[in-house]
Every structure is written in C-alpha cells, then in structure tokens.
Amino acid sequence: MTTKLPRWLRSTPRRSFMVYPIVVIGFETARRGGFEVPGAYFLPLLLWGYLEYRLVGIYRQRHNAGSRGLGEMPKRLLQNGPFRLTRNPMYLGHLIFMLGLALSFWSLLGAGIFIVNVVWFHRRVLWDEALIHGEFGSEYDEYRRRVKRWVPYVL
C-alpha cells in the first residue's frame, strides 16, 4: 500500500520554508532543553534564501516565463535578470535558506537536511533541464554554455 503525502507537504516551498524550520527548531529546542536564540551571524542567509526564492518567482511570472517552479513549462527561456547569473536561482534560494537554518541553530539535523536537499535539488535540476532542453533545444544549449547551473561563474 502506498500513501501519498498531502499536497501541502509535496510542495517544495512549504517543505523548505515551513516544515524544515519547524522540525529543526523543534528538534533543537527538545535536544537543548529549551529554546535558544539562533546565532545572528547566519540569519541573513535565511532572509537572503527566502527573498531570492520569492522575488525570482515574481520576476519569472512578470516576464511571462511560467509560474514559480516547473509546475508548468516556461513560455519562454529567461536569460536575463537573475537568470543571467545562475540557471537555478529559485532552487539556489531554497538551499541558501536551508544552509542558513543549519548554521543559525548549529544543528546537525539541519546540516543533514541541507545535504539531502543539495542532492535532491541537483537531481531535480537534471530532470528539469532535460524537459527545458526538449522545449527550447539549441537556444537552451547556448544558455547552458554561458550560464553556470548553480553558483555564478563557478559551478
């Protein structure tokens, strides 16, 4: 018998920005015997990651390139704005947020969630790229040659 997760749990943004923080904060609060204020040095990563995800999603919608995520195929290939720096700025926002979560709470559980999601998002990107290549062909090949998959100018 297979059970499907509820739709709200299958949603990547809900997992990244709601479920994982609740799990990490709850786990660390129980492990430490009470809530501790997170390390302020890494809180900007949380804000950066979340805002990157949200603002790039809005940018994508406003430039008629589909909805946030690949719930629907983009109507056109965005190659400007944040997409001129990295091919996956929204997914990168998720990962920056999760890294900030792990570091803010010095959480091994948070680090584990981050590592698992690095692998998951990378596999998801490979799948997305195959779909996008099928839709845009040589235009996407040229874009791939110019723009890195994850970290601008590096990776």
Model-based region annotation:
Residues M1-N80, L92-L155:
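Membrane-anchoring alpha-helices and their flanking helix-loop junctions
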Residues L85-P89:
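Histidine-centered phosphotransfer motif of kinases
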